[in-house]
Amino acid sequence: PRPPPPPAPVAGRRFDLIASNPPFVLTPPAVREAGLPLMEYRDAGGPILPGLVAGLAEHLEPGATAVMLGNWEHRGTGSWRDTVAAWLPEGLDAWILERELQDPVEYATMWLRDGGLTPERDPEAFDAALEAWIDDFEARDVRGVGFGYLIVHRPRRPREPWRLLEEVTTSGQGVLGPHVAEVLEVRERLAGLDDAAVADLRPLLAPDVTEERHLIPGAAEPTVILLRQGGGLGRTLQASTAVAALAGVADGELSVGQVASAVAALSELNAADAAALRAEMVEATRHLLTTGFLHPGN
């Protein structure tokens, strides 16, 4: 069962933004029994983080966001996504980003050193604590520990929430905060748009996006087209020629539907293929907008 939220001095209060670096380190009791003292600023993350996340619904105003750092276990053959998804409160959007994955030995060694226990200073104590930590992980079939961000958002109006739990290890240039805020805003807007409304959008290509083409010598058409993001999360997207064409003319003047019609006419597509092309561009527009490659324009 999910642990209840811990008592909080902010009980009954709501906020527009919550930022938290809670004690999230997964330090097993056996480690402290082996001689490593509890460090209040970081330890006991196992039961604390799920409770904090579960209680966010009581503290977020409509349109508000909570951002947390956290760890979660990768157990057995199960998915870490299922573990973290079980923490999330109903009715709220959630974007969970796993930024790094460490194996148990790496994880335990890092936090033992952070606590001042190193093999150079006290090899016997270090080995005992490391063994206790690894024994606990093995007993619970923990095969890795993920590090990342938990971003939880209350919709401005009641609607079906969206959930995205993904592994993204790349990074773009600059700070991440504005990118996160834009993604949440775009997703809020797209949640109320059907495909016809998305086709009417006039998107703008983000200024940090570049295109990379791979061609076999002598070939007229590229074998691979990549769109690369310089900011945000530094994502790379493999694009079809149609999606690359959309990105190439996304200057805020033409709608997605107009671009689809123009490409279909130039390619002399029949009605069925033209409809499929339009659907592809609409779907791609949603993805490019929610990852920051495109801005909504109108």
PLM region spans:
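S-adenosylmethionine
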Residues: P1-L117
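Intrinsically disordered, low-complexity coil segments
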Residues: A8-A11, R159-E160, G218, L266-A274
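Generic detection of long, well-ordered alpha-helical segments
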Residues: G12, V142, A274-R278
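Residues that form generic nucleotide/phosphate-binding pockets
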Residues: W87, W133-D136, V249, A262
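Rossmann-like AdoMet/SAM-dependent catalytic core
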Residues: L92-A245
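Long, charge-rich, low-complexity alpha-helical segments
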Residues: V152, G232-N298
